[in-house]
């Protein structure tokens, strides 16, 4: 358990204090690289006892050692190489000379499997399906006790690990294909070797290793390949703002400024002990924690005190805040993301806690990724509550003095208003479906509103459904809007089978297991027979829209024209070339009768005939029409 970790820590500290200790090379990150990259510069972070002061040399045609960075710890060395255009795939011989002793290592250079310019990202033609690997399905393939910290698989505890694996996801790709999603976003899969199991994945302890409780690096790459064979893209969840408290760095920090608000070594040990025992101590109380007030990042009147607390404060005591202003650390993180794109073939990155990291450093990262993969997409989690704040984070915003270079932002204002928008009666100009109209009217703030990730819920929010519904009218209305408005829709796993829950007690209640994904489950929603009649109705409704959406340019690239719901009916049109569709939604629990349709002559006239996308029925526009309570029509 902890013995192994503290033994390693002790050895590293002993190395720091012993001048005559033998020099060693234990690890090099990245573990390998590729020839033919657009950026020919490569940083190799070398870790090993006493390695800092060793003298390195490189022997490989086309590869040049440009410089060596030596920081505070004696156990790290940073090599900066140029991988020239004439470098060939193979091995790079690296020698570290320490006194009379020489350590020889071979570093592997691989040939790129494809052209970065053609590497496909996700966009508004896709629908992302967000799932938590620990909670989706157990493939029965992983030996679970494979970490330094003890933990339990306990499905009765919403805060414990439940045993989901990457193979469990692979086993149910037929289900995702049947549903009709075109991309999956997995919450973080990298190693989180932390007390309690850290099932959610947001406390990385190894940036180059898939958590063994999910599977291996090869398993991850295999899953992505299987997804691609079915036309499903994969988005990887990453965190640059912080790492896990028990990352090896925390036992021997490379430099005095590797972390923001960096405690002393003894202080870190005390914080680790407090997290292990669950008992606060003075070290925890003295930590600078974030104030979570993200409006400080764009506040023109912000005090330095408040700003520093936002971006330099630790997220929680178990997640040390990384200092992206340290150029060696930022290069490490940039290369890590490029490594996963090249190694695994991911199609996008969702960057957690985006505004908490240094804005200029993150812009450097976005530029670096776009240089290698121009069609790749990155979405930043910017949990801001109004449209202007969200727009500020997107690249090309004219009010932000820093061009963030961030292509896609998350439409949190839509998420935060969703339950009211579809739960209230649409009467005044500010309630019910008017909220959607007013929200879209602010799209002029965005540099590119087609690059908004639209969603109603995720693993950090209440589910859209707080309890099991008895009627699907409002739910269908909400899903129809999400899948037909501008942006890139994201649905949370289980939405299609009416999973519900609130995080009022604990986040675990909005992260429940997918029924049928685990041994012993009494029902399985992965098959139609395992779903209730209401679940079948919900699944079929969503599946029809998702399949209709695939390849539909009117949805992915169409212009949008909408009519304010002053008569309780919200109507909008999407058009691209000769393809278009119209959506009509009754925003009340009462039927609308004898609605004068003349106000919509810009998009439809009496006698025009459409096909109802859901039912397949023909619908002919009349001068006056009636709509049942909460009716939703998608007409093509």
Regions found by a protein language model. Name each.
Residues 224, 242, 251, 336-338, ...:
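Active-site-proximal helices and loops of the catalytic beta/alpha 8
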Residues 1-26:
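Bacterial Sec-dependent N-terminal signal peptides
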Residues 22-53, 105, 109-114, 118:
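Beta-strand/beta-sandwich contexts
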Residues 447-470:
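Active-site clefts of carbohydrate-active enzymes
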Residues 2, 6, 21, 101-103, ...:
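Carbohydrate-interacting/catalytic domains
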Residues 131, 176, 186, 207, ...:
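Conserved, mostly hydrophobic/aromatic
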């Amino acid at each position: 358990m902890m013995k192994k970790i503290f033994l390693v820590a002790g050895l590293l500290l002993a190395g720091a204090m012993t001048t005559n200790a033998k020099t060693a090379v234990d690890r090099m990150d990245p573990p390998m690289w590729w020839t033919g990259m657009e950026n020919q510069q490569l940083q190799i972070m070398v870790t090993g006892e006493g390695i800092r002061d060793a003298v390195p040399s490189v022997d490989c045609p086309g590869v040049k050692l440009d410089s060596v960075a030596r920081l505070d710890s004696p156990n790290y060395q940073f090599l900066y190489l140029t991988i020239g255009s004439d470098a060939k795939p193979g091995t790079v011989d690296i020698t570290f000379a320490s006194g009379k002793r020489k350590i020889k290592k071979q570093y592997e250079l691989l040939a790129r499997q494809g052209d970065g310019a053609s590497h496909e990202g996700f966009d508004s033609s896709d629908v992302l399906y967000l799932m938590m690997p620990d909670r989706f399905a157990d493939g029965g393939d992983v030996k679970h006790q494979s970490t330094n910290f003890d933990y339990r698989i306990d499905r009765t505890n919403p805060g414990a690990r439940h045993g989901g694996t990457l193979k469990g996801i692979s086993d149910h790709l037929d289900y995702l294909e049947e549903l009709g999603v075109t991309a999956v976003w997995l919450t973080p899969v990298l190693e989180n070797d932390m007390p309690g199991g850290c099932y959610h994945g947001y406390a990385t302890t190894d940036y180059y290793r898939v958590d063994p409780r999910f599977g291996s690096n090869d398993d991850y790459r295999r899953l992505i390949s299987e997804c691609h064979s079915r036309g499903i893209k994969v988005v990887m969840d990453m965190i640059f703002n912080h790492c896990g408290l028990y990352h090896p760095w925390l036992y021997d920090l490379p430099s005095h400024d590797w972390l923001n608000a960096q405690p002393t070594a003894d202080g870190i040990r005390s914080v680790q002990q407090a997290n292990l025992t669950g008992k606060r101590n003075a070290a925890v109380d003295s930590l600078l924690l974030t104030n979570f007030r993200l409006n400080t990042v764009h506040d023109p009147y912000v005090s330095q005190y408040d700003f520093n607390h936002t971006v330099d404060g630790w997220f929680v005591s178990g997640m040390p805040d990384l200092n992206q202003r340290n150029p060696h650390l930022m290069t490490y993180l940039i290369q890590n993301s490029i490594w996963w794109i090249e190694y695994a073939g991911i199609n996008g990155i969702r960057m957690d806690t985006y505004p908490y990291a240094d804005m200029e450093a993150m812009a450097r990262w976005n530029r670096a990724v776009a240089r290698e993969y121009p069609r790749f997409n990155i979405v930043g989690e910017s949990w801001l509550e109004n449209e202007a704040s969200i727009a500020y984070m997107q690249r090309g915003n004219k009010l932000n003095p820093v061009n963030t270079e961030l292509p896609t932002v998350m439409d949190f204002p839509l998420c935060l208003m969703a339950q009211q928008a579809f739960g209230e009666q649409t009467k005044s100009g500010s309630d019910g479906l008017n909220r959607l109209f007013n929200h879209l009217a602010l799209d002029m703030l965005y540099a590119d509103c087609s690059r908004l990730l639209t969603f109603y819920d995720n693993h950090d929010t209440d589910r859209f459904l707080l309890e099991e519904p008895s009627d699907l009218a409002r739910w269908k209305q909400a899903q129809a809007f999400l899948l037909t408005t501008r942006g890139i829709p994201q649905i949370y796993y289980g939405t299609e089978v009416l999973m519900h829950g609130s995080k009022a007690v604990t986040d675990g209640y909005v992260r429940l297991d997918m029924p049928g994904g685990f041994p012993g489950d009494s029902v399985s929603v992965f098959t139609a027979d395992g779903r209730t009649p209401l679940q079948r109705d919900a699944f079929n409704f969503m599946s029809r829209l998702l399949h209709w959406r695939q390849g539909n340019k009117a949805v992915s690239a169409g212009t949008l024209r909408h009519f304010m719901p002053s008569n309780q009916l919200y109507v909008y049109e999407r058009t691209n070339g000769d393809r278009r569709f119209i959506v009509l939604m009754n925003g009340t629990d009462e039927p609308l009768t004898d609605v004068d349709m003349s106000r919509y002559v810009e998009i439809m006239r009496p006698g025009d005939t459409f096909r109802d996308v859901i039912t397949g029925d023909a619908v002919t526009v009349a001068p006056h029409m009636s709509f049942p309570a909460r009716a939703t029509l998608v007409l093509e």
